[in-house]
Amino acid sequence: MSIDYRKTVNLLDTPFAMRGDLAKREPAWVKRWQEEKRYEKLRKLAAGRPKFILHDGPPYANNDIHLGHAVNKVLKDIIVRSKTLAGFDAPYVPGWDCHGLPIELMVEKLHGKDIPAAKFRELCREYAKEQVARQKKGFIRLGVLGDWDNPYLTMDFKTEADIVRTLGKIHENGYLTKGEKPVHWCIECGSSLAEAEVEYEDKVSPAIDVGFKVVDTDKASAAFGADAAGAMAVIWTTTPWTLPANQAVAAGANLDYQLVDTPKGKLILGKDLVESAMKRYGVETYRVLGEAKGQALELLQLQHPFYGRQVPVILGDHVTTDAGTGLVHTAPAHGLEDFQAGLQYKLPIANPVADDGRYKSTTELFAGMLVWDANPRVIETLESHGSLVHKSKLEHSYPHCWRHKTPIIFRATPQWFISMDRKANGGETLREVSQRAVDATEFFPSWGRARLDAMIKNSPDWCVSRQRNWGVPMTFFIHKESGELHPRSAQLLEEVALRIEQQGIEAWFSLDAKELLGEEAEQYRKLTDTLDVWFDSGATHFAVLKQRPELAWPADLYLEGSDQHRGWFQSSLKTGCATIGRAPYKQLLTHGFTVDDKGYKMSKSKGNGIAPEEICGTLGADILRLWVASADYSGDMSLSQEILKRTTESYRRLRNTIRFLLSNLSDFDPLEHVVPLANMVEMDQYALLRAREVQEKVVGELYSRYAFHHVVQEVVGYCSEDLGAFYLDVIKDRLYTTKADSHARRSAQTALYHITRSLLLMVAPILCFTADEAWNVLVDSEEESTLYHIWHEFPAQTVEREAALSSKWQAIRELRAAVNKEIEALRSADKLGSSLQAEVEIDAPAELARHLASLGEELKFVLIVSKADVREAGEVAIRVSPSAHGKCDRCWHYRADVGSHAGHGAVCGRCVDNLDGQGEPRRYA
């Protein structure tokens, strides 16, 4: 009776399927993880370990999550999981930013504007709560592990109270100031904007040259050494609407100016800009009458171009000759540099523009006009007064509101600021403390340091007050006459904070001042301003990290998009330094934006976005997570259907490797079958050494410096080159054809067991679903998780033994690659079938020849040929020829003894021994 030899080989199966079906199966795993309370279990397991705290920058509670959200949360999850596997207690408390204008606008859209303030805030709170639930569902679907049942919300009563306390501490430390300063003002918002709320877009503006007639002719003539009668000092501006607020013309003290006679009259211009100005005016013939330093023009009186008042020439360091005329129109109410110069010269800070962007009723010529509509009227007025020298248009970068995408204005308003340059109680300015804190912070990528440092160096005072309804109130009492804060502000603020803990911000808005001030209430009013939402999120290091027992201050890491250098990173830095004197983080990591395959930023309006929900629903969250990890987040991260296709292919290769490993461990019990390292087949010892080297690089170097795309490259390369193309390829013969319980096979399985554990733990932070699916198969328990363990610990040998192993097997691998090249050449020429049909003769130098010869008959298994002979020679030479022998039906080797064994068909003696005898011994391969 013939034997079916296919049934005699050790081809095992595994419940770990070839196809992941992630999109269908992941939701069930998510549900099971929640039911098992994995996060809570992990906290108990990690209790007592050193902590690693990643503080979540709160996304805004509005609309579904987009791809940028997914990138951010997946990167955070990879870090939290990898730190957990590294032996840390790494809790993750997700958060949401819940106050602010976008929610107000949505509530107005849904319910209208005519709503009582208290009811409006209630509706805002309800809306934010709905949005949090909506986004939470999306983040959980991504496999992000965290305390989803107890997130922090900036609208939590306790958090609102602690935000108020943070403000109080900043006031106590002497950094809070009040003043009328020019701030970014959005007409549509009806509120000031923080730096982080301003975006720059291209805009076409009128560009005009305006003449200010010289009043003090004698002073000007003396300065230029020429007759200046009838001369005009010329400024250039792209904001004609600010001219009603003009109070001076600024010159550079050390810049050279010329008095130029032109067809347009006598003009005073910066020397370096005369030629470009004449070209702009279309003037070909002109004559320089005289020259003077800016210093000589200081306090020269000029006539306002259309009002009756006179304005002086002042000196300012901000004046340059890069463009324009070298003289600068100065309106202290409409620009920060103008404002600073105005303070120095005690100029009026006259703001003619109201909150709605219209000129106040007292503004001569332009009362009631919207500033943008006034530009043509201002130009007409200049023409009628003979003050317009030239007009044109200019496309330039201009600040816009990030919400409305509309141009904003600078206008002086009474606001509250956190001062950057006031020496506070500690004797240092906030700028000094903040710059020292930046120096002490580690940045990923490293260029983030220069960016944040430059922002702190150039940061104006932080305007923290807003004229909004839905926000944390600035809970101060202001004296009605003096405008000063109540002398007991610190005590009163704490009393209010205690009430807010119980009732939320409504405790302040509904508060009768008499409850806290008694008879003093007649002299004080409640401040009605709310805090900038960047202050809310910036204060969460105090409101969350310092208040929750499972967390710690400062955080080890803040991780957000690169736009947060000017946003959350900066607001957190300033509140940390202003309250505690240092940054609330040790490390900052920034990632780029998501772009399409053409490099364009993804957006709904362009229709080039891919929603996380779509990817999870078709391919699975693990594919999305693998793409995030594979992309170099230090720059913009490209995604397209083609990139997703390539990512899916990489995933399949990884999955197939894991499936092969698990299949060949189906009958392996680590408690019973493990072979001690010293007794293992030599190639298996080398495989463990390589696996450990890879893990040490991935864990000790790449994960620790957050180089996830290099983690993926290293792991994929290892699976492809070390495992697929070498080790697994070689040991198939031993796994399949030796006796099931033989030392040779159990040695290979021991190596595979260590490799599988290590590999699954290395990919677990990235492929959280797949790694746990495979882990459950490996340990035969659905209640197990990779996260309940730490990085795999390999058995180790002496340094000398490992060095010898590595040197020997690296040389053998290089020789094997050369043999394969020769075999492939014959196969391409149709002179050879499989590599097992080949017989090989090798000439090699002495050391390599000794390495090869030491394997004896087992060299052929390493080369996957049927015969291999080695001869010492001066250089490597390889000769490959087809075997003349028959093919074994069981192991497919070509041997002389095939078919020569009684009771067996076309099989070789090796297979007969493995079937009926003691089994073949293996020492090397």
UniProtKB/Swiss-Prot annotation:
GO molecular function per UniProt: aminoacyl-tRNA deacylase activity; ATP binding; isoleucine-tRNA ligase activity; tRNA binding; zinc ion binding
Gene3D superfamilies: 1.10.730.20, HUPs, Valyl/Leucyl/Isoleucyl-tRNA synthetase, editing domain
Motif 'KMSKS' region: chain residues: 601-605
Cofactors (names): Zn(2+)
EC number from the UniProt entry: 6.1.1.5
UniProt keyword annotations, A-Z: Aminoacyl-tRNA synthetase, ATP-binding, Cytoplasm, Ligase, Metal-binding, Nucleotide-binding, Protein biosynthesis, Zinc
Coiled coil: none
Motif interval(s): 'HIGH' region: 59-69
CDD domains found in the cross-reference section: Anticodon_Ia_Ile_BEm, IleRS_core
Binding site for L-isoleucyl-5'-AMP: E560
GO biological process terms on file: isoleucyl-tRNA aminoacylation
Catalytic reactions of this protein: tRNA(Ile) + L-isoleucine + ATP = L-isoleucyl-tRNA(Ile) + AMP + diphosphate
Keyword Nucleotide-binding attached: yes
Role played: Catalyzes the attachment of isoleucine to tRNA(Ile). As IleRS can inadvertently accommodate and process structurally similar amino acids such as valine, to avoid such errors it has two additional distinct tRNA(Ile)-dependent editing activities. One activity is designated as 'pretransfer' editing and involves the hydrolysis of activated Val-AMP. The other activity is designated 'posttransfer' editing and involves deacylation of mischarged Val-tRNA(Ile).
Record family assignment: Belongs to the class-I aminoacyl-tRNA synthetase family. IleS type 1 subfamily.
Subunit structure, as described in the record: Monomer.
Protein name: Isoleucine--tRNA ligase
Source organism per UniProt: Chromobacterium violaceum (strain ATCC 12472 / DSM 30191 / JCM 1249 / CCUG 213 / NBRC 12614 / NCIMB 9131 / NCTC 9757 / MK)
Lineage of origin: Bacteria, Pseudomonadati, Pseudomonadota, Betaproteobacteria, Neisseriales
Primary gene name: ileS
